[in-house]
């Protein structure tokens, strides 16, 4: 690391798998920015101390992954509207003695759907599968795209209803119908289905019936790699267009880079390079 390079990192547990250092290194090259970005494995009970240490080292910003997104929102000095709505943060900006929290997950998802996949969300019917932290982090930005309807389903119906209730005011403002449906029998089909669960990791079946799909629906899994494959295979077998969350990963990173550096890096070439690297076993 050169003396002029600003320090950034991603904090999580586990963290060894993170592609973020590679992504941000490419962003820095493409935008001629001088920075150093590293992984930091944080003890489960040591997140607050890790933030203090990072700030003391002169750190300028960090990405936050599981399981610290809720704690990141709580420990920040200021919070964006997205963080206030989601209750979780994936991006921190250090400025003097203050820490500003933001959440770029939903922005990344929206960018990958509308630009990467070329599927508009305005006026469309969207099914959000899951009501945990991943779903909460993206519902606000999805609503801001003015879809006709967003339905939320979850194994625990009360959690789906709670997520709907927490976003009801924004939905009314956007004139979008927002409701919770029965996961096993939603009774409707959708243009876009977003899987925000870890069903594949848990070895379970796809959590919704094929009746939710329309011909040509976009079925999007927020995960990527082997974790997303069962959902993607299911979607393809039923005639949907399947897309994993690798583009979301790159796009949310680009939004974080914009917050830190004031310039949004080109995401398409970085995503293309990343897919090629993963396909080659890197």
Swiss-Prot record:
<protein>
    <recommendedName>
        <fullName>Shikimate dehydrogenase (NADP(+))</fullName>
        <ecNumber>1.1.1.25</ecNumber>
    </recommendedName>
</protein>
<keyword id="KW-0057">Aromatic amino acid biosynthesis</keyword>
<keyword id="KW-0521">NADP</keyword>
<dbReference type="GO" id="GO:0008652">
    <property type="term" value="P:amino acid biosynthetic process"/>
</dbReference>
<dbReference type="Pfam" id="PF01488">
    <property type="entry name" value="Shikimate_DH"/>
</dbReference>
<dbReference type="GO" id="GO:0004764">
    <property type="term" value="F:shikimate 3-dehydrogenase (NADP+) activity"/>
</dbReference>
<feature type="binding site">
    <location>
        <position position="65"/>
    </location>
    <ligand>
        <name>shikimate</name>
    </ligand>
</feature>
<feature type="active site" description="Proton acceptor">
    <location>
        <position position="69"/>
    </location>
</feature>
<feature type="binding site">
    <location>
        <position position="90"/>
    </location>
    <ligand>
        <name>shikimate</name>
    </ligand>
</feature>
<dbReference type="GO" id="GO:0009073">
    <property type="term" value="P:aromatic amino acid family biosynthetic process"/>
</dbReference>
<dbReference type="InterPro" id="IPR022893">
    <property type="entry name" value="Shikimate_DH_fam"/>
</dbReference>
<comment type="similarity">
    <text>Belongs to the shikimate dehydrogenase family.</text>
</comment>
<comment type="pathway">
    <text>Metabolic intermediate biosynthesis; chorismate biosynthesis; chorismate from D-erythrose 4-phosphate and phosphoenolpyruvate: step 4/7.</text>
</comment>
<feature type="binding site">
    <location>
        <position position="105"/>
    </location>
    <ligand>
        <name>shikimate</name>
    </ligand>
</feature>
<dbReference type="GO" id="GO:0009423">
    <property type="term" value="P:chorismate biosynthetic process"/>
</dbReference>
<feature type="binding site">
    <location>
        <begin position="18"/>
        <end position="20"/>
    </location>
    <ligand>
        <name>shikimate</name>
    </ligand>
</feature>
<feature type="binding site">
    <location>
        <begin position="130"/>
        <end position="134"/>
    </location>
    <ligand>
        <name>NADP(+)</name>
    </ligand>
</feature>
<dbReference type="InterPro" id="IPR041121">
    <property type="entry name" value="SDH_C"/>
</dbReference>
<feature type="binding site">
    <location>
        <position position="222"/>
    </location>
    <ligand>
        <name>NADP(+)</name>
    </ligand>
</feature>
<feature type="binding site">
    <location>
        <position position="245"/>
    </location>
    <ligand>
        <name>NADP(+)</name>
    </ligand>
</feature>
<feature type="binding site">
    <location>
        <begin position="154"/>
        <end position="159"/>
    </location>
    <ligand>
        <name>NADP(+)</name>
    </ligand>
</feature>
<keyword id="KW-0028">Amino-acid biosynthesis</keyword>
<dbReference type="Pfam" id="PF18317">
    <property type="entry name" value="SDH_C"/>
</dbReference>
<dbReference type="Pfam" id="PF08501">
    <property type="entry name" value="Shikimate_dh_N"/>
</dbReference>
<keyword id="KW-0560">Oxidoreductase</keyword>
<comment type="subunit">
    <text>Homodimer.</text>
</comment>
<dbReference type="GO" id="GO:0019632">
    <property type="term" value="P:shikimate metabolic process"/>
</dbReference>
<dbReference type="GO" id="GO:0050661">
    <property type="term" value="F:NADP binding"/>
</dbReference>
<feature type="binding site">
    <location>
        <position position="224"/>
    </location>
    <ligand>
        <name>shikimate</name>
    </ligand>
</feature>
<comment type="function">
    <text>Involved in the biosynthesis of the chorismate, which leads to the biosynthesis of aromatic amino acids. Catalyzes the reversible NADPH linked reduction of 3-dehydroshikimate (DHSA) to yield shikimate (SA).</text>
</comment>
<dbReference type="InterPro" id="IPR006151">
    <property type="entry name" value="Shikm_DH/Glu-tRNA_Rdtase"/>
</dbReference>
<feature type="binding site">
    <location>
        <position position="81"/>
    </location>
    <ligand>
        <name>NADP(+)</name>
    </ligand>
</feature>
<dbReference type="InterPro" id="IPR036291">
    <property type="entry name" value="NAD(P)-bd_dom_sf"/>
</dbReference>
<dbReference type="InterPro" id="IPR011342">
    <property type="entry name" value="Shikimate_DH"/>
</dbReference>
<dbReference type="InterPro" id="IPR046346">
    <property type="entry name" value="Aminoacid_DH-like_N_sf"/>
</dbReference>
<dbReference type="InterPro" id="IPR013708">
    <property type="entry name" value="Shikimate_DH-bd_N"/>
</dbReference>
<dbReference type="GO" id="GO:0005829">
    <property type="term" value="C:cytosol"/>
</dbReference>
């Amino acid at each position: 690391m050169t003396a002029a390079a600003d320090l950034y990192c991603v904090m999580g547990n586990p963290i060894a798998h993170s592609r973020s250092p590679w992504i941000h290194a490419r962003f820095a090259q493409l935008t001629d920015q001088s920075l150093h970005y590293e992984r930091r494995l944080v003890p489960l009970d040591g997140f607050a101390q890790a933030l203090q240490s990072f700030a003391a080292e002169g750190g300028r910003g960090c990405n936050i992954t599981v399981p610290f997104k809720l704690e990141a929102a709580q420990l920040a000095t200021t919070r964006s509207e997205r963080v206030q709505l989601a209750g979780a943060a994936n991006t921190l900006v250090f400025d003097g003695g203050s820490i500003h929290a933001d959440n770029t997950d939903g922005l990344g998802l929206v960018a990958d759907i509308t630009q990467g996949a070329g599927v508009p969300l305005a006026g469309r019917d969207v099914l959000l599968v899951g009501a945990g932290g991943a779903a909460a982090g993206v519902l606000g930005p999805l609503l801001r795209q003015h879809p006709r309807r967003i339905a939320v389903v979850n194994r625990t119906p009360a959690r789906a209803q709670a997520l709907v209730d927490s976003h009801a005011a924004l939905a009314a403002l956007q004139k979008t119908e927002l409701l919770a449906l029965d996961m096993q029998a939603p009774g409707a089909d959708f243009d876009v289905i977003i899987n925000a669960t870890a069903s594949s990791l848990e070895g379970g079946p796809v959590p919704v019936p094929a009746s939710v799909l329309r011909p040509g629906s976009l079925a999007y899994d927020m995960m990527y790699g082997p974790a997303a494959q069962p959902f993607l295979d299911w979607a393809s077998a039923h005639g949907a267009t399947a897309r994993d969350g690798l583009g979301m990963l790159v796009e949310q990173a680009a939004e974080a880079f914009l917050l830190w550096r004031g310039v949004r890096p080109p995401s398409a070439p970085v995503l293309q390079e990343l897919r090629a690297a993963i396909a080659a076993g890197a």
